[in-house]
């Protein structure tokens, strides 16, 4: 194989390589044997057409495209490796010569990984706005949240207040004409929940069961139903019931109702304190890691980040998001319909963070390379076993899904992140 690379501009160039006749001839034989099985040529049994007759009747060249399709992927990968390139986007391939009896010549316009000039990435000073200490207020807030979850709704005679639930019938109209979706019966509405159009819930505060209220609201300009957007509507609303939350007493019985593993309120508080301490410690570590990596990225210089890398990152993020939806049993088309968004909106959303994420990945990879980090066979095996345990998969399944190179890359990245983080100090 002959390989050459010519730089055209920063992070871009043309890779030229050949596929030799030593590779082409056996592949031609294989393709011919496959093709002749389906050929019907007068005078010959199906599948028994001699090669010279085929070449005379159809031409050896008729097999070239199938041969090229079979050989090109591996030939391109080998050329990239021999040229010592790190390609970061799909190449633009052009077959420049496929002459009979000669090596085939291919060119590929490629985008290469940009140069990263590292600044300081060890012993960084960072600031984080995350508290490690667990306060009594933190514990009480957690218990109060669980206590409210156990609250019961009881009918009250007094007027409705924010936080109450009202059971209502309503009929909506615009200029005296009812509209689709504007009617409901025995609907439970939490006042202050924001379930309804802004202003609707506020107008029920201060009213009691048995009252009928004319609620006047204006649909938001960006309302999903375009025929209603920006229009004023009247909802004739009848209140059937007003219900208030009744929370249980703060005692040992409540503690046992919240968590059957504890006996007293004091036990529950101690358990929550430990859980919150663990969660806060993790949040603190994550904040330090994020701040340290952000600082390392700020200290580095990336020479002309290619747009193609950002596009690849957006594409990867969108596919990951849509894949997660499908794994949860959510049809992407249904998601877009419900949220009133499009796939283009999703691309635009990820576009904003793709450049930052791409820069971060490049800097971490550069740190791993600068430090000479590698991964041993033992480390790779340990990573496979951990992934299998995390995702409830067989070890063999993980090995089939992830190549050794991918696993090695992930391990070296983790080592780089650990180095940046562990040497950082918090101001």
Swiss-Prot record:
Keywords in alphabetical order: Cell cycle, Cell division, Chaperone, Cytoplasm, Isomerase, Rotamase
GO molecular-function terms, A-Z: peptidyl-prolyl cis-trans isomerase activity; protein folding chaperone; ribosome binding
GO cellular component: cytoplasm
GO process terms (BP): 'de novo' cotranslational protein folding; cell division; chaperone-mediated protein folding; protein transport; protein unfolding
PPIase FKBP-type domain ranges (all copies): 163-248
Pfam families reported in the protein's UniProt record: FKBP_C (PF00254), Trigger_C (PF05698), Trigger_N (PF05697)
Family annotation (SUPFAM superfamilies): FKBP-like, Triger factor/SurA peptide-binding domain-like, Trigger factor ribosome-binding domain
Protein's cellular compartments: Cytoplasm
This enzyme's EC code(s): 5.2.1.8
Record keyword Lipoprotein present: no
Reactions this protein catalyses: [protein]-peptidylproline (omega=180) = [protein]-peptidylproline (omega=0)
PANTHER family: TRIGGER FACTOR CHAPERONE AND PEPTIDYL-PROLYL CIS/TRANS ISOMERASE, TRIGGER FACTOR-LIKE PROTEIN TIG, CHLOROPLASTIC
HAMAP family: Trigger_factor_Tig
Description of its domains: Consists of 3 domains; the N-terminus binds the ribosome, the middle domain has PPIase activity, while the C-terminus has intrinsic chaperone activity on its own.
Family under the similarity heading: Belongs to the FKBP-type PPIase family. Tig subfamily.
Function: Involved in protein export. Acts as a chaperone by maintaining the newly synthesized protein in an open conformation. Functions as a peptidyl-prolyl cis-trans isomerase.
Identification of the protein by name: Trigger factor
Gene giving rise to this polypeptide: tig
């Amino acid at each position: 194989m002959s390989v050459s690379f010519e730089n055209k501009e920063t992070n871009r160039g043309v890779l030229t390589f050949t596929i030799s006749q030593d590779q082409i001839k056996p592949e031609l034989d294989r393709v011919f044997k496959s093709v002749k099985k389906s050929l019907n040529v007068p005078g010959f049994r199906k599948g028994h057409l001699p090669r010279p007759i085929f070449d005379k009747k159809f031409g050896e060249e008729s097999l070239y495209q199938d041969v090229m399709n079979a050989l090109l992927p591996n030939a391109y990968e080998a050329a990239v490796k021999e040229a010592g390139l790190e390609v970061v986007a799909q190449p633009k391939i052009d077959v420049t010569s496929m002459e009979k009896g000669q090596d085939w010549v291919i060119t590929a316009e490629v985008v290469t990984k940009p140069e990263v000039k590292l600044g300081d990435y060890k012993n960084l000073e960072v600031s984080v706005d995350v508290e490690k200490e667990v306060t009594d207020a933190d514990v009480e807030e957690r218990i109060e949240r669980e206590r409210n979850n156990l609250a019961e709704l009881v009918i009250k005679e007094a007027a409705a207040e924010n936080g109450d639930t009202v059971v209502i019938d309503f009929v909506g109209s615009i200029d005296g004409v009812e509209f689709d979706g504007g009617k409901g019966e025995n609907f439970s509405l939490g006042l202050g929940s924001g379930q309804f159009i802004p202003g609707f819930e506020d107008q029920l505060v201060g009213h009691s069961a048995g009252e009928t209220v004319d609620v006047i609201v204006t649909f938001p300009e960006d309302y999903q139903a375009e025929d209603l957007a920006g229009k004023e509507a009247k909802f004739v609303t009848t209140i059937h019931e007003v219900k208030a939350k009744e929370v249980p007493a703060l005692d040992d019985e409540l503690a046992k109702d919240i968590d059957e593993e504890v006996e007293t309120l004091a036990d529950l508080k101690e358990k929550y304190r430990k859980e919150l301490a663990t969660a806060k410690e993790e949040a603190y570590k994550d904040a330090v890691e994020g701040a340290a990596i952000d600082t390392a990225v700020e200290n580095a210089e990336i020479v002309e980040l290619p747009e193609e890398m950002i596009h690849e990152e957006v594409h990867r993020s969108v596919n990951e998001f849509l894949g997660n939806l499908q794994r949860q049993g959510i049809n992407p088309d249904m998601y877009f319909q419900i949220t009133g968004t499009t796939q283009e909106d999703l691309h635009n959303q990820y576009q904003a963070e793709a450049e930052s994420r791409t820069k971060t990945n490049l800097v971490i990879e550069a740190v791993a390379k600068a430090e000479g980090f590698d991964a041993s066979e033992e480390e790779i095996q340990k990573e496979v076993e951990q992934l299998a345990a995390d995702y409830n998969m067989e070890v063999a399944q993980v090995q089939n899904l992830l190549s050794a190179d991918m696993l090695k890359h992930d391990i070296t990245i983790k080592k780089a992140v650990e180095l940046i983080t562990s040497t950082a100090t918090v101001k």
